[in-house]
């Protein structure tokens, strides 16, 4: 059931060296720097995104994710979701408007998996970067690098998947698009969506709470993905796997690392969902094919390197 949560809105990542991180996210991924704040955080967006930022970088001593935020339809929905979270037993933290530049008040909570999420209703609307709202051209001419289209999703590793599933489906209004079941029928991976997308956030069982596997950015075509692979090679960027295809979601994909060790994905294509679609199920005996559809062999680094 729709509870008013619209889409992924932003993610804040910790990076070890801001200048190297910006070279990666701006020059290689093609994000646009939009702002900086007095804490030293840098705000970035992809060119099609209409709000001011979707990625916040914070310099720190270790990499990883501070939090992921979802935008809700309006303040009334935010107040109701806040009440629902508290009624469900979640401790919520109020973050005032302006704590993130150009963003309204946020309601933060911790999922049973150990990850921090937040909800907000307002963020400065800047429109698509480099385009007018009236009679727009197809794309801006001066995009850099991969010219990432949007921040799309994040994949988390943590424990307590059933409780996390209940929170996201019963309180926040997500639905299960795809899953992986072990030989006992226990769900060990869950791909959750708010929309027709293959997923907006995903969780994989891991004994340690609160770990990040990757943040993902959308590209338009397979040719864009191959060009992204060329740019990864040209810049000697550390690559994990790809270009290849997932069995899960059927998206075409490349995984690589930012200079701090945070894993990034760029992808195109993939499945779509409507309310009458049943969840797609994979079994762990086919996990190699589910993750890497062509090779059908698990990459140990892909499964174990987390931030």
Curated annotation (Swiss-Prot):
Keywords: Aromatic hydrocarbons catabolism, Dioxygenase, Iron, Metal-binding, Oxidoreductase, Plasmid, Repeat. One of its GO terms (molecular function) is catechol 2,3-dioxygenase activity. It holds the Pfam family Glyoxalase. The keyword Metal-binding applies. Its cofactor is Fe(2+). Fe cation binds at residues 153, 214, 265. InterPro entries: Catechol_2-3_dOase, Fosfomycin_Res_Enzymes, Glyas_Bleomycin-R_OHBP_Dase, Glyas_Fos-R_dOase_dom, VOC, Xdiol_ring_cleave_dOase_1/2, XylE-like_N. PROSITE patterns: EXTRADIOL_DIOXYGENAS, VOC. Its EC number is 1.13.11.2. Gene3D superfamilies: 2,3-Dihydroxybiphenyl 1,2-Dioxygenase, domain 1. Pathway: Xenobiotic degradation; toluene degradation. Signal peptide: none annotated. It is an enzyme of class 1 (oxidoreductase). Belongs to the extradiol ring-cleavage dioxygenase family. Homotetramer. This is Metapyrocatechase. It comes from Pseudomonas putida (Arthrobacter siderocapsulatus). The gene is xylE.
